[in-house]
Each structure stands twice: as C-alpha cells, then as structure tokens.
C-alpha cells in the first residue's frame, strides 16, 4: 500500500472550504494514491511487552473498542490503558494536552469534521506513510481498497500526509416514529415542504408529543442547520474563502431550522444536544429526530426504548435544490509526540480492521468505513440491526456531502453560528442573525487561513 505525494494546486485547498467538496470525498483523493506494498514479514507480536495509552470519545464506537481491548492485548502482547470521555471534554482536553508538548496518550480518536484541519495545521499527529510503507509494520490486511473514499478523503491531507486511519462514517438521517405517523395517516416526507407539514400535523403539546426534535444547544446545533443549507444548494464559502453563510440559501435554511424547532420542537429545546433529543425520541415523545446514523442500537434496546420495533429510518428529505445527507466521520491517529509510534500504529490498524468494522455494524453502533463489513455483517447470524437502518445508511452515503467546512477554526465556526441558531429558536430574525454571524466569523477565518 505504498503512498506517494502529488503536487496539490492552491485551488484544491480552497475547495476544502466549500460544501461542494462532497463530490471529491466520494471520488478521487487529493494528494495521495494507494498501491499494494511488497510482501514481507509482519508479526503482531513485534512490540510484545509494550504499553500504550488510548484516548477515546464516549460513544457506541468507543464502547465497542473498549469491549475488545483484551482481544488486541492477546493478539499483540501490548497492554492498553484507555480513557473515554464525552466528545466536548475530549476535544478540549486534546488541545490542552497537545499544546503541552507531552500528551498523556499515544493514540487519539478524532472527529474529522472538528479536528482534522486543526490537528494537521499544528502537526499533532504522526504521518503514517512511513509505517504504512514498512512491510514489518503494516498488516497485509490493512487493504485501503476496502475503505470508502469518503473516509479516505478525511484521512488524507491535501499535501499527501496520512495522519489517521478512518473508522466511522456518520451520514445524517431522520429517525421517525412509525406509530405516530400511522395514527395520522402520514407517509415519511420526501421533501422539506412535506417535512414541515408532517411536523405540524404530528405536533401535539397536549399529549407531550413534539413534531420534531434536534439539537438546539449552541455549537452542537450547527449540523442541523447545515443539513438544510445543503438541501437548499448553499455552500459555506466560495473558492476564495469568502463566507456564503449570509446567502439566501443560508437564510432559508435558518428559517427552516427556526420553524421546526421553535414551532414544533419540545419546550427547552434550545438546551438540547443529541442525548436529550435521543431521550425524548426513545420515550415516544417526538415524531421525528434528525441526527447521525449511529443511534439504532439504543432505539432498538428494550431496556432503554419504549418504541422498539416502531422506529423508521429515513433518508434526509430533498431540499428545493438537491437531496443531501450531511456527512461526518471519525478516525484514529497516532500522537506525533509519542515514542511508541509502532505499537500505537498496531492499535489503530486493529481498531479499523474488518472484524471490528463488522462488529460495529452488527451492533448498529455506526456506519463502517470498510465496504466489506456490510456483506460480512449481514451474512452473520449475529446480525441484529434493522434491515431498514442498513438500507437508509447505504442510501444516505450515496448522497453525502461534508456537513461542516473543513477549516481549522471549525469550533469557533460552530460557536458563532450556534449562538445565531439558538437565538432563532428564541425568536430572533434568521436573516439578521446569519448576517451578524457571518460578519463576526469572516475575520477569524481570514486570520486562520493566512496563518
């Protein structure tokens, strides 16, 4: 799997700012190509007796890896110490530890949509190419041809560096309560207009039922708005880095967000993140919930959910211009500061191997980045995920585009526009808020790109 550099034109870097980068994510990879390595001696026991520290995000995927750490230890003889915390705390701690120059971890899970550009600009992750090209370090089954191109797009930098291995894809979908829809004689909406109509008809405050729920909490709420932005045909920025977040499309997306959450959402939704939204939905108190694909497991768990067997999995309805599923992704990287790069690289190869990817799908814990996992999981007698969920996942992946701009200050982007969106829930004018947020964030983006 030798990886070679290519010259990257400046326009490719600029395209990373645009929502339209989704086409590239599913097509040719910028900056790298993958070929087969020469065969050689690879031994999982090469680093027997070593110990590594792993820093994971609390999620069904993090739980899955932790559950099978003993398998990795038995396979390699490498001991694993791990810490797993909620994503916001994980992101904050990662910055603090990397800036210290002596992070406590050797391996880190990263959310590409938030940390990819930040980590790359600061050179916080080891370039994996030397190890990928070392026949004694690269598992012959690493097999980049098995990885979805959307995942590889996120893992490879425009200059050709490979800073991580992709682990999970997260296209956004609409979960819906089939029982509530059937009671009103409604079909799953195919368009934004039908989505608004369904939310209005299913909203019943007298019974404590909301027509729609999604993230209202600032920062966390931006992917909800961007899901609508993409359907309206909008972009985050043009090819020169000028924000387009005050465009007519962006404002219409803001209006859609405001109507669904303020008019048909639950009381207090401005403070909802995904976990509060999930809780409401699995109690049968929301007709629709827009979020990432990886929540089927708790929704179908009778110890947690009151709507087992009643959950519908719907592809994001089409906007006026196009039908798009906002795409996010996660990966695993090796700290540039660690002295245990070899053992750490062994860990991330194991984490993204075909067995773990298949387990992820079997547990309905996420959308594997390996294409072989889909056939393997469905052929297994252990496969318990709803067929409709898998079909929704695959259909969503076909229309996916990145749900956030690939920029270093993406957290600041989410903070600034997240406040604007929360203000809209509380009655503020969408056009005014989008223009204000755009004016506030443009200098931040300009400074970041010049740096």
List the predicted regions and their residue ranges.
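Hinge/lid segment of periplasmic solute-binding proteins
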Residues: 39-46, 112-171, 308-312, 381-384, ...
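Long, aromatic- and glycine/proline-rich binding clefts that accommodate carbohydrate-like moieties
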Residues: 48, 311-314, 362-419
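Glycine-centered hinge/linker elements that transmit conformational signals in sensory
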Residues: 198-205, 240-270
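Extracytoplasmic/periplasmic substrate-binding proteins
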Residues: 115-117, 223-227, 252-346
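Conserved C-terminal helix/tail region of periplasmic/extracytoplasmic solute-binding proteins
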Residues: 45-47, 51, 79, 182, ...
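Extracytoplasmic "Venus flytrap"/periplasmic binding protein-like
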Residues: 70-147, 179, 183-190, 287-288, ...
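N-terminal secretory signal peptides
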Residues: 1-12, 22-28
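Extracytoplasmic/periplasmic solute-binding protein
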Residues: 152-167, 172, 193-243, 286
């Amino acid at each position: 799997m030798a990886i070679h550099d290519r010259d990257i034109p400046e326009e490719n870097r600029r395209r990373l700012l645009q929502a339209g980068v989704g086409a590239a994510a599913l097509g040719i990879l910028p900056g790298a190509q993958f070929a087969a390595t020469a065969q050689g001696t690879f031994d999982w026991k090469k680093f027997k007796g070593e110990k590594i520290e792993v820093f994971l995000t609390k999620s069904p995927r993090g739980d899955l890896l932790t559950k099978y750490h003993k398998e990795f230890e038995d396979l390699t003889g490498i001991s694993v110490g791990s810490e797993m915390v909620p994503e916001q705390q994980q992101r904050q701690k990662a910055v603090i530890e990397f800036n210290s120059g002596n992070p406590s971890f050797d391996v880190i899970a990263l959310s590409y949509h938030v940390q990819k550009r930040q980590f790359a600009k600061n050179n916080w992750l080891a370039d994996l190419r030397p190890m990928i090209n070392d026949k004694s370090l690269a598992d012959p089954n690493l097999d980049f041809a098995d990885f979805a191109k959307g995942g590889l797009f996120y893992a490879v930098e425009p200059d050709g560096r490979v800073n991580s291995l992709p682990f999970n894809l997260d296209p956004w979908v609409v979960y819906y309560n089939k029982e509530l829809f059937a009671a009103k004689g409604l079909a799953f909406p195919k368009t934004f207009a039908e989505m608004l109509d369904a939310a209005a008809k299913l909203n019943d405050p007298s019974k404590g039922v909301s027509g729609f729920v999604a993230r209202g909490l600032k920062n966390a709420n931006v992917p909800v708005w961007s899901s609508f932005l993409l359907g309206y045909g909008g972009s985050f920025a043009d090819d020169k880095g000028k924000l387009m977040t005050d465009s007519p499309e962006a404002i219409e997306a803001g209006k859609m967000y405001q109507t669904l959450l303020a008019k048909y959402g639950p009381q207090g939704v401005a403070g909802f993140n995904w976990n509060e939204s999930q809780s409401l939905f699995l109690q049968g108190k929301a007709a629709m919930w827009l979020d990432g694909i990886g929540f089927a497991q708790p929704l179908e768990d009778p110890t947690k959910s009151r709507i087992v067997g009643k959950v519908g999995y719907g592809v994001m309805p089409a906007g006026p211009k196009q039908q798009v599923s906002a795409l996010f992704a996660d990966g695993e990287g090796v700290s540039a500061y660690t002295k245990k790069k070899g053992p750490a690289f062994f860990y991330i190869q194991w984490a993204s191997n075909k067995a773990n990817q298949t387990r992820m799908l079997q547990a309905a814990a996420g959308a594997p980045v390996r294409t072989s996992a889909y056939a393997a999981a469905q052929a297994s007698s252990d496969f318990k995920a709803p067929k409709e969920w898998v079909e929704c996942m695959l259909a969503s992946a076909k229309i996916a585009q990145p749900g956030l701009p690939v920029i270093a200050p993406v957290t600041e982007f989410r903070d600034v526009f997240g406040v604007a969106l929360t203000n809209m829930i509380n009655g503020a004018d969408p056009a005014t808020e989008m223009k204000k947020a755009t004016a506030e964030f443009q200098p931040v983006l300009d400074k970041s790109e010049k740096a």
